[in-house]
Amino acid sequence: MEDLKTTDALSLPVVSDNGGIIEPELQLPQAIPTELENNEEENGTIQQSQSEEDSAENGKIYMDDTFLPSKSQVKETQDSPTTPSFVSPSAEIVLPRVNTKYEAEGTTRNAVSPRPLYSPRSIGSPRALLSPRFAGSSSPLSNGTPISMDSFRDSIDTASPFESVKEAVSKFGGITDWKAHRMKVLERRNFVEQELDKIQEEIPEYKKKSEMVEMSKMLAVEELESTKRLIEELKLNLEKAETEEQQAKQDSELAKLRVQEMEQGIADEASVASKAQLEVAQARHTSAISELESVKEELQTLQNEYDALVKEKDLAVKEAEEAVIASKEVERKVEELTIELIATKESLECAHSSHLEAEEHRIGAAMLRDQETHRWEKELKQAEEELQRLKQHLVSTKELQVKLEFASALLLDLKKELADHKESSKVKEETSETVVTNIEISLQEKTTDIQKAVASAKKELEEVNANVEKATSEVNCLKVASSSLRLEIDKEKSALDSLKQREGMASVTVASLEAEIDITRCEIALVKSKEKETREEMVELPKQLQQASQEADEAKSFAELAREELRKSQEEAEQAKAGASTMESRLFAAQKEIEAIKASERLALAAIKALQESESSSKENAVDSPRTVTLTIEEYYELSKRAHEAEEAANARVAAAVSEVGEAKETEKRSLEKLEEVNKEMVERKATLAGAMEKAEKAKEGKLGVEQELRKWREVSEKKRKNGSSHGKSIQGSKEKEAETSVSNETETNPIPQVNPVKKKKKLFPRFFMFLMKKKSHK
């Protein structure tokens, strides 16, 4: 057992969510009461940590790249108990004011006594205090309340630390092979480019296929229209055939009735068949006349439409000519506007160049003015310094004058004393001649010295006065020069103001020119749009003319077809009339033959009656009735044959029309099947085209992403290169500045080379420098 006496405690550092250490730090919270010593026996013994071992070097324990202080270092910290220390994981952790007592019950294998669980070294271990187990709770020692030591049991993390950063990064999955990643990116980029090239190569093929499909679709549509026209024509022919069949049936029925009536011996006036035949012929005639009138009306409407189309064609031609003339005028205006635009651009460029020249001149004048003002300021400062020196010299000369006056006054006093002494010592002249001579010699020497000093002082005063006069004259000259410089500066300022005004005027003119250019551009855009519209209209005009001509041709063809149908109907009507006339003539001939036969029969009957009367009353076996009509077998066969031929012809026409209708239906089915196949192919090709376009878009997106990555990489590399070049330039600039400062120092220390002036205004400065050099040499 050992006693643990602490006045301060350690607080746990901030722990991240994943249990890692962010910043381990040691603070000095409130003091823990000394009741821990009394409660030590109640809390029981504390298990010792057998995993920790000392390094036996300077009393420090190395654990996880950290070490703890020895006893002497711990005692040294008692002088400053209030200063908190923030310790990083790789620095030394110094515990504040911890007194420990060690028992000598045993030693470890390193000949160091075993440490208890909560010795300063175990408490100071970051692996012990900063374990992830303590992430959710605060330190038990930070509240300042007496807490049992059993709460710290089983909380030491003795895992081996990370040996390197690479191991720590690889443990959390943060290590990557950037070279392999770049190679993968390059391979992916190459693959995307290859896919894009393939898709771009496939796009024209798919376009050709789509064009072929559209052409086939157009052909199928044309075939469908042609088949529809054929079907309509066949329907018309079928209707005509049906009408002809009905007419033939009616004719055959009427012929049969007439034959029956003729067999029955019915007269022409009382025959129903002849009346019905006449009514049918009249109805057909009226229908033909009505059809003729309708066809004439249709022809008249078609003629009117044709005339209207011709008028529209003439109007379209006139409009096209007017549009051509307007387009030529627009082109001429566009050419004039382009010439004006070129001229305005040239004037704008000239104004811009003059503006740049004026700006350069202004900048150069400003630089020269600044340089001149800087030089004049330096020279004025130097002149002021020289004036100060001359003033000091004048003060010293005045002091010398005062001293000279004082010496002359002393000399006069001495002379007076000498005269008094001579008067008083006339008796003792003989004895004091030698003394007087010596005194006179000494006085003469003094007077000569004083006179020499006075003469030298006078000379110096004269020189100082001359120097002062020269300095005042030079100062006046400098003032005149400064006033002239100020006048020049004012002139330059006025020139700058005028230049600024000109620049403002130039900017206004430039803005107006830009506005005019914008207006001209807008007008040009409008003219171009109008040109495009006129060109489109010009392109559409021949199409419209072609359509009008096609419509006119169609109308002509329709009129011709109507005329042909009318002619056919007229021919059929004439044929029907001719057939009716032939039938009437035949009927009339048959009636006459019947009358002749009747007459012959009557004569034969009369003869037979006479013979019967004359002969014995023999019965007549072969007496024909007066109402019966006798026909020869040949005539009967001919009539039956004609009726049968008419029926066969009508049946043949009906069969041909039915076969044509069936063929038309079959062709329509085929065209519909072709259309369905073409539509299916179109859908499939559209799907393939959409897939190809999606692939192309994806490839473009990938390419854009790769290009963005390349741009970012280039920007980063350019920034690095620019930073390196700017660093080099800054070094060169500092060297150049040092060289310039050294040159300026040399020029300041050696002002003699500046004697050769560049301008006439600097003639005053060599005199001033010569005066300074003379003064220095005199001193």
From Swiss-Prot:
Residue stretches in coiled coil: 182-503, 532-587, 657-715
Gene it is expressed from: WEL1
Sites of Phosphoserine modification: 139
Keyword Phosphoprotein: yes
Domain of life assignment: Eukaryota
Protein source organism: Arabidopsis thaliana
Organism classification: Eukaryota, Viridiplantae, Streptophyta, Embryophyta, Tracheophyta
Biased composition (Low complexity): 650-661
Protein name per UniProt: Protein WEAK CHLOROPLAST MOVEMENT UNDER BLUE LIGHT-like 1
InterPro entries, per database record: Web
Compositional bias segments (type: Polar residues): 79-88, 741-753
Segments of skewed composition (Basic and acidic residues): 662-674, 694-718
The keyword rRNA processing is annotated on this UniProt entry: no
Keyword terms of this UniProt record: Coiled coil, Phosphoprotein
Region listing for Disordered, in residue ranges: 1-119, 650-674, 694-759
Family: Belongs to the WEB family.
